[in-house]
Curated annotation (Swiss-Prot):
Keywords: GTPase activation, Ribosome biogenesis
Taxonomy, superkingdom: Bacteria
Organism field: Aliivibrio fischeri (strain ATCC 700601 / ES114) (Vibrio fischeri)
GO biological process: ribosome biogenesis
Pfam families: YihI
Protein name: Der GTPase-activating protein YihI
Amino acid sequence: MSRIKKARKPGMSSQPVVVTRNRTDRDVESREIKRKRKRKGLKAGARNAESNAEQARRNAQKKDPRIGSKKPIQLVVEAKQKTTKQERRLTNEQELAMLENDAQLMVLLDRLDSGENLGTGLQKYVDEKLARIEHLMGRLGLLDDEEPEEIEEFPEFAERKAKSDDDLLAEFDDFNMDDFK
């Protein structure tokens, strides 16, 4: 039998059928999963192609670090003057002011005043700072001398300090050990 060709003639069918589809979330998710399954593996011909990360790394290695610097370069080199120890060292007044305003030292002194025991490291820190403050006050003349009172209490020590070496040697020779028995 011979084939009969269908002809399209207007009015043959009543009205064109319009189909509307509502895509639910599940349909969209299933399509994404299906697309991912189809695209497993690497791209075709990617065996010899370099990745972008590798290309960027190689370009970074080839780049000359001298090119593109915006930092101004001095043509004449000026020698830097080194500060001497005396210039770097604080004056006694400045150091004393810094030690008196030391917040950590003040907190530790308050803890000591309240009767709290400090650890060995903290106690050593406090002792060092207080000794330094006392030394600086002595150098600046702000320290009240308590030594003359001690000399008045023990006059025999004051006499010994005033003697010369010859006097001490003569006293040693004349010393009688029987006095201590």
